[in-house]
Regions:
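Intrinsically disordered, low-complexity N-terminal regions enriched in serine/proline/glycine
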Residues: 21, 52, 95-98
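Short, surface-exposed acidic/glycine-rich loop or hinge patches that mediate macromolecular interfaces
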Residues: 23, 40, 100-102
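Active-site activation/catalytic loop segments of kinase-like enzymes and analogous catalytic loops
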Residues: 29-58, 71-89
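Short conserved motifs of the RecA-like P-loop NTPase core
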Residues: 62
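Active-site acidic catalytic loop and adjacent metal/ATP-binding pocket
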Residues: 1-30
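ATP/Mg2+ or Mg2+-diphosphate-binding catalytic cores
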Residues: 79-116
Length: 116
């Protein structure tokens, strides 16, 4: 649930996930959605990330699920950023990134839902 690049340490061919503050047993799309929403990936790049995770082409329902979860994760982090900003703790460019991803992936999730 906090699965994004600042929480990875990379040294050579080793990689460590740090910061377990928001860890939990949850839906696989939670980590994927957070990873994508905290990146500058567009929709097509996000689809590639999802497929790399699965190691195969995805079923339409799986795609919709991952895209919808990316929208939800983006919205969660956007609201968190608004709160932090209101408390005088600026989050910088993350605020706009999460806002933009909420809109983009939310609209795409609605399109995918209508087509299934």
């Amino acid at each position: 649930n906090d699965f994004y690049d600042p929480n990875f340490l990379v040294r050579g061919d080793e990689m460590y996930l740090i910061d377990w503050e928001y860890s939990g047993m949850s839906d696989y799309a939670s980590d994927l959605g957070t990873f994508v929403c905290c990146s500058d990936y567009g929709y097509d790049e996000a689809l590639r990330v999802y497929e790399l995770y699965f190691g195969r082409s995805m079923a339409p329902e799986e795609t919709r699920h991952c895209v919808a979860f990316t929208a939800l994760a983006s919205f969660y982090w956007f609201v968190w950023a608004l709160y932090k900003e209101a408390c005088g703790d600026p989050v910088g460019e993350w605020l706009y990134l999460w806002y933009r991803n909420t809109k983009a992936f939310g609209n795409k999730a609605l399109e995918l839902s209508a087509s299934l």
